[in-house]
Amino acid sequence: MVSKLLKTITQPVRGLHQAAYLLASLTLASQVLALVRDRLFAHQFGAGEMLDLYYAAFRVPDLVFALVASLVSAYVLIPRIAGADPVESRRLISQTASFLFIAGGIMCGVIALFTPTLLTLVYPNLMQGAYASEFVFLTRLLLLQPIILGLSGVATSVTQVKRKFFIFALSPVLYNLGIIGGTVFLYPVFGLPGVGMGVVIGALAHFIIHVPVLMEAKLTPRFVIPDPKVLWLVMKDSLPRSMALGMGAFVTLALTALAARTGEGGVSVFTLAGNLEAVPLSLIGAAYATAAFPVLAEHHRKKQGVAYRDTIS
């Protein structure tokens, strides 16, 4: 029974529509869990100061993720490893994973050092509250997330190329389960930092589920000193997208800072509305795009123009 389940989970999904339906189904499950998560937050904290602090603590780590991880994201790696030589693919994955670990670690370390000052500048109202120390600790804890999810993003490039879409779609489900577990089990013991621990656990689960795919494909990254020439070949194509994502994250940070100035619950209402808005895009647009992209990348690499057009149509 267990072996049959594992075989189903790890089996490649070849058909485009089959992959899209699978992704949409698991995305729906993930979004339902996200709604359960938000409902738990509203029940546990209410749309007040504690929930404001939780959502506000994500904004700086999200900005780091947008600026660093998007430079070497799966969307840039997939066209380079789809149908490519395994040795070259592993070299590229090792280079990008090492860059993310080093650059993300340095940036997050510097921000962690100056977190109290930064939060006072961005969220002066929240830093004047009774939970300022917990807010600082939670933000520092969440700075682990960009590094972990960045590495997971590199791993998902292999998962998508190998068309293990069940595993790919399961990772955000595990992420939300980690947050829910942190809210239910760790918050009563540790308070608000306990929810942050759940976020980190969820991020680790998001990454770890891809490790067997990396091992099976013999593409497990090794720690190396990044080669600027290799990285530049990747980054030059991702700079426009990275700048757009970075600007989007910065705008969200600015809007969250403004929401924090409107009074208690402002950040919570703004964030919950944004979470609801993302549901239809994730269910429909992202599912087909995720399923089609590795197939299109492989057709392009192999110069299969007819197959490329057929997939799009």
Residue locations for each model-derived region?
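Hydrophobic alpha-helical transmembrane segments
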Residues: 171-181, 185, 189-216
